[in-house]
């Protein structure tokens, strides 16, 4: 077992995680050298990466790679400045990591395999620990191979210590393009977007709609909002004059979305 890049014994690991419920966020208070010479509350989350049969609300079930058996993975919601501990157990057949997209971190916690850390091997455990800064809406995901496309992603919400504006309701919308086939499809159907369509690049694939230009491939089976497609997407319910905060996360491999709200101007 591994924590902070170092091997630890099973007994030590069990001592540090005893009483933690799988998938739950448990506040605790203890001394941890990784966080400095102080006692501060730590928000602890437990993730298991594993293959899971899923259905996005339409079509047949298929095998995705998930955190805690769900797509997207569990939302992590913390306050700015809180300390986060994520215990990742890898039950997948391949090595995996968690990258905290947009969060400035020391290399050991950044989750880029073969660059900032070794991938967590099948059957092993790794502990990520870092301070929740800055406030904002972020995406966490595997940075190994096509694992994000296979379902290993979720939202990280860091609430500011002081709200800049008031609102009545809040929704987080995670957008994803899906090849709804076991393990992301075969070698012939797996997502292989050109380099200029990858994360952080100016991809040309627009959804949903006709292909535009030479960069339209690959074709996806569905476009999901919070893990649901088409008619299965849950509507946003609001009252007249409500002030609504939308947190938008694009976890797609190669899709740009044009968003509309009926009767409203964006």
Question: Predicted segment positions?
Answer:
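Histidine- and aromatic-enriched segments that form or immediately flank copper-ligand environments
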Residues: 40-163, 218, 254-266
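Bacterial N-terminal signal peptides
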Residues: 23-25
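Acidic-aromatic/histidine active-site loop/patch
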Residues: 172-243, 249-252
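C-terminal segment of classical bacterial N-terminal signal peptides
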Residues: 27-31
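N-terminal secretory signal peptides
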Residues: 1-8, 19
